[in-house]
Amino acid sequence: MLRGQSLPWRAALHQTPRPTVLRPLLPFARNNGPVRSNLSISRLSRSPSLSPRAFSTSSIRRKEKPPSDEKEDSNLQEQKDPNEQKDSDRSPEGRRRSPDSTGREPGAPTSASGRRRDKVAGEKEQRGVEEDAKKENVSIEGKSDPTEDPSPIPVNGGGSSDTKSSASNGGNEDGGRKGKKGSGDRALQKPSVPEVYPQVMAIPIAKRPLFPGFYKAITIRDPNVATAIQEMMKRGQPYVGAFLFKDENADGDVIENLDDVYDVGVFAQITAAYPLRGEASGVTAVLYPHRRIKISSLLPPGEQSKAGNTEDKAPEKKGDVVASFEEGVAEPAPKDLYEPTSFLRKYPVSLVNVENLAEEPFDKKSAIIRAVTSEIVNVCKEIASLNPLFRDQISAFYTDQFPGNLSDEPAKLADFAAAVSAGELHEMQEVLEIMNIEERLPKALVVLKKELMNAQLQSKISKDVEAKIQKRQREYWLMEQMKGIKRELGIESDGKDKLVEKFKEKASKLAMPDAVKKVFDEEINKLAHLEPAASEFNVTRNYLDWLTQIPWGQKSVENFGIKHAMTVLDEDHYGLKDVKDRILEFIAVGKLRGTVEGKILCLVGPPGVGKTSIGKSIARALNRQYYRFSVGGLTDVAEIKGHRRTYVGALPGRIIQALKKCQTENPLILIDEVDKIGRGHQGDPSSALLELLDPEQNSSFLDHYMDVPVDLSKVLFVCTANVTDTIPRPLLDRMELIELSGYVADEKMAIAERYLAPAARELTGLKDVDVNLQKDAIEELIKSYARESGVRNLKKQIEKVYRKAAFKIVQDLGEEVLGEDKALTDEGKAAQEESKKETEEGDPKDPPADPEKSTTETPRLALKVPESVHLSIGKDSLTDYLGPPVFTADRLYDTFPPGVTMGLAWTSMGGAALYVESILENALTPESRPGIDITGNLQPVMKESTQIAYSFAKSVLAKQFPENKFFEKAKLHMHCPEGAVPKDGPSAGITMATSLLSLALDHPLDPTIAMTGELTVTGKVLRIGGLREKTVAARRAGAKKIIFPADNMSDWLELPENIKDGIEGHAVSWYSEVFNILFAELDKDAANKLWQKQLAGKPKKGPLEEDD
């Protein structure tokens, strides 16, 4: 079926069919030689009454004659009057004869002999064209023409529903049933189409225009237009004009305004009309276009005007040619214009005055025309190879439209290309309007190319869909066959069904969110349709396993008891007041609200103060599950966010693994060493922690492997770090910092007695043995072996003491008391005998024959030490267990010489004493040049503090001691001991300035005074950090006084009394206060005149002066 046509047009195809001669479609090559086509040919019946006619008017006639058959002429002459025969031979209607010379009615069945006669008639018809072209060279003006007859033109068999002849020749409306062979007169009757029809009823059409020679079925719903069509059919004048709407969405059967439609359309014949189903007034009309026409004026519906009115004139386009292009023919005087549609004035329909459009003359041998024609034929072949229906259309079109050579009908070929294509509205209309064949053919080729692309796309989609359907049908068929075979053989299933049921059972016990439930259902359906041998099966199974092991909606019952939490925390840790207070606050809030949200805490402190171990105690106090993982040195983001499932061996991140292990949504997760996280080519894990540790985001944490949101808002995160300098600022901002300072000697003593010593005794097997580590020994151990702020090294030293004691006990008692045979059980003795036997049979140098048996741990019993054993470890015997003390002295100097001061520093190990030494490199002389050298592995900030202190010291000496010229001539050297330890920070400013002034004033300082504070060039003392650690270091170094900035007074007040015990604190704001404390006993007059003797000598003479 042609595009845009409906079922009724098939009936019109068989109105008055004629047998045609089948010819192959012949494309043309560049040498103009015919090439045989492989395109298949199918037969098509086409009514000769509906074939396109040559254009003419009342005063102009075409020069060409249609082909005629000699036999037909002779037959007609026998049946007609000679005069009539003479006139009819000259008229175009008389020359158009039916090629059927057998006398049978068109549409009757054709026998084999009839088909042979058809072939002979076709050959004669082609020869007749050539003879007529030679003979017919005279004008036909003045001859009789049916179109000049003012009476209505009858249409016999042209679609009239009430003519008797239409029923006899198969031209009725029932779809063209073949009628019986009628009489010879009736067989020779044929309808005629007027070449001039100045006024027609205009019917607007939508979507695509009509092209001459191609049927189109349209639907008429306007009752007036439907009634007019029926009237036209009854009168035998079923001719209308079809014009395309400019608006694709427009609808209607009447043209209200000439601007609504294109002015170029087609003159069409209504071959059949059928009433619409379900509608009383509507009809479906089948139109057959004959030629192109152009609107000259519009008579709006209901207007009673004559056809001569020229209102709403349509603009005339360039290239529009009216009537024939024959030259040298004189036009007769105009006659009164016949109006065949005058009976339609009573209906409110659209009447238009039209004029015929004729094609411009063209050269059939033009290279452009031949090339484009050949390309159109090639494209048609390609489309035909993809679409069988299009192949039938091409065959029917060639059989019907091309009785001669294909190159002789390029205009029809262009119309065919546009008629069967699905182009744009304006493109199709352009093909209809263009009268120049060389311009029309490329336009039609473009439209046909688009149809080729559509056909290719449809073919591809059809093949893909068909392949998918076949694949699914094949899989389904095979699966059903396999199930049937297993069922017949009684073979059990592969376990997939049980696996699916297991996952569904697990999921039913979990409170999955809607988004997770949706993903679970999709994955379980995928698993059910996968074969166990498929690689995707294991991936899906592992994913479902992880998805069902996450504790969706499962929480542990928390304990909000304050007393219980205090008891648990004190059992495991001594001190750590800040941490314990924060956890108690957390519990109190949960007790009041009834629930608690997850928090992110960060414990910052030196090593060994209990940051990691306190996390486990917090989980026990809150009755939460505990999970710890370290991120120190971590460089792969996938450890936190997981791997994508596309990778082999992919796993979720550590957070999802923690939830799987804890089986609760509210565990305590300890992220250790967060300040030592790394960065590599696999990403920045610290940036991945931003989402994890953000309370606003972790409620929908997205792991790469799980790819579903996981709620972490109820998890209590505890991070640990030694320093905060290496933690990115955005990450640090998301955590609540709790600083843990180092332990003082008293705290270490309590920790050692309560926790470390009992644990070490049990670890070394001395739990039930009378081994006593005296208190003075622990004090000496803390003082001389473990000065660190933490207790990790102290724990090591205590364990070492007990190990030495265990060795001493075993050695003293001997093998007689603690024999090996007493330690073995019966199983152990049997294993020992078997091992000994195997050793004797084999070479002693050979490795064991059965490594698994030989390396298996032999069952043993713990030996009991006799109660008579007593061991006491005191201060004096500590060297026998631990060796010489590591720290031999608390301070470097018993008394300070001039230029030496004791400062205080903060390190990751806690606080430490920082000594600053300044000396005079050379003796002072008038020729001396000032300067200062700095050593001690000082970092940039501390070097700047040295320059500030040097400049400030010179300023103080110049103001308060103007006669002292020490800094003007002194070459100085400043050093900070322990040069292997890098030192940085601004807090040693007042210490350095004091060291320089002590040397310049030659005044030694009190060795029991320690100081810390940042100094500016104007003498202002600024705030410092780590006052607790520095105070502990000062106390350990034997300091009695400590000078610190006044801005740190609040930190000083918060220090425990056991730390401040025996130390006097002095808060200062300016260095003048520091000077008054340190140099209170200084003789200012003597200090002012100091160094005058050294600088008063005469300068040495130069070499020239000595010669004189």
Swiss-Prot record:
This is Lon protease homolog, mitochondrial. HAMAP family: lonm_euk (MF_03120). One of its GO terms (cellular component) is mitochondrial matrix. It is an enzyme of class 3 (hydrolase). Homohexamer or homoheptamer. Organized in a ring with a central cavity. Residues 895-1081 form the Lon proteolytic domain. The keyword Zinc does not apply. Residues 1-62 form a transit peptide. The gene is pim1.
